[in-house]
């Protein structure tokens, strides 16, 4: 079920609790302010260690100078300087001076024994100073080793942070690689499907090309037939033109005959109309004569007679 999750969902889970934060295998990245404050603390700590080392170095040289002044006694040193930094031999001389002054009365040591004792004390002081110098050198070396160890720890912490960050990047890249592999498988399946479709399309195109060739041959045959039909149509048109010419000539001749016939009939009708008009005018003249002939008679009788004639 987890393999089916998207790589972003694996990298950024939707549910996150405090236990997830404490149980995670990598350290959370620090904020910029935290990094800056940490760098400031490191710088202050480094400055403190440098100052401490300088103080230790100054104390070391000071102790060396004091020890050298103690063990290198010079009788030509002025008295005021002797009071400030009295050497060990001078101190022993001062201590043993009253003893030497009263050696015959009070001291149980002889002068040569006191010299041997003084010599042994000087050797012990010199050995103690040597051991102290060695101890200071060891302390200085130890502080240097501690500083180096601290720097090493800091570098180790940085290396751990870098390792954790690189592990996080590697894990994220692993998730990304898995997702890319899934996408690759999906793309491969899509490519196979497209290849299958392409093969089907190529088969269809070949079939269409064959059909196109057949259709081209049929078109050539139809073109030849069309040319034959055009020739036949031209011949038919020519024949039809001849027939139409003959028919037009016949129609023209019949038209002229019918026209002449109609003109003759029109002339006859006009002649009959003229005769009718002439008869009508004669009738009108006769009617006028009758009106004049019966004008002398009574109005009623003449009117009835005229009406009767008109009716008849």
Swiss-Prot record:
It comes from Xenopus tropicalis. This is Coiled-coil domain-containing protein 160 homolog. Belongs to the CCDC160 family. Residues 126-281 form a coiled coil. Keywords: Coiled coil.
């Amino acid at each position: 079920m987890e393999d089916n999750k998207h790589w972003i969902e694996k990298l950024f889970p939707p549910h996150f609790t405090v236990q997830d934060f404490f149980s995670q295998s990598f350290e959370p990245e620090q904020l910029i302010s935290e990094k800056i404050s940490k760098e400031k603390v490191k710088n202050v700590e480094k400055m403190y260690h440098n100052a401490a080392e300088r103080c230790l170095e100054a104390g070391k040289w000071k102790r060396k100078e004091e020890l050298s002044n103690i063990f290198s006694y010079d009788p030509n040193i002025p008295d005021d300087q002797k009071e400030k930094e009295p050497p060990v031999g001078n101190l022993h001389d001062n201590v043993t001076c009253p003893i030497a002054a009263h050696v015959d009365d009070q001291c149980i040591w002889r002068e040569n024994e006191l010299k041997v004792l003084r010599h042994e004390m000087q050797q012990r002081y010199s050995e103690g100073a040597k051991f102290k110098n060695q101890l200071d050198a060891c302390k200085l070396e130890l502080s240097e080793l501690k500083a180096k160890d601290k720097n090493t720890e800091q570098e180790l912490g940085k290396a751990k942070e870098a390792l954790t960050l690189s592990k996080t990047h590697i894990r994220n890249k692993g998730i990304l690689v898995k997702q890319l592999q899934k996408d690759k498988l999906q793309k491969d399946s899509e490519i196979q499907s497209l290849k299958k479709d392409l093969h089907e399309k190529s088969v269809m195109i070949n079939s269409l090309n064959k059909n196109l060739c057949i259709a081209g041959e049929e078109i050539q045959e139809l073109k030849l037939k069309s040319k034959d039909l055009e020739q036949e149509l031209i011949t038919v048109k020519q024949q039809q033109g001849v027939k139409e010419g003959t028919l037009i000539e016949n129609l023209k001749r019949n038209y002229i005959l019918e026209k002449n016939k109609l003109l003759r009939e029109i002339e006859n009708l006009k002649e009959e109309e003229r005769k009718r008009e002439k008869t009508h005018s004669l009738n009108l003249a006769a009617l006028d004569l009758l009106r004049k002939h019966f004008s002398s008679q009574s109005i009623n009788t003449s009117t009835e007679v005229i009406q009767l004639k008109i009716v008849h």
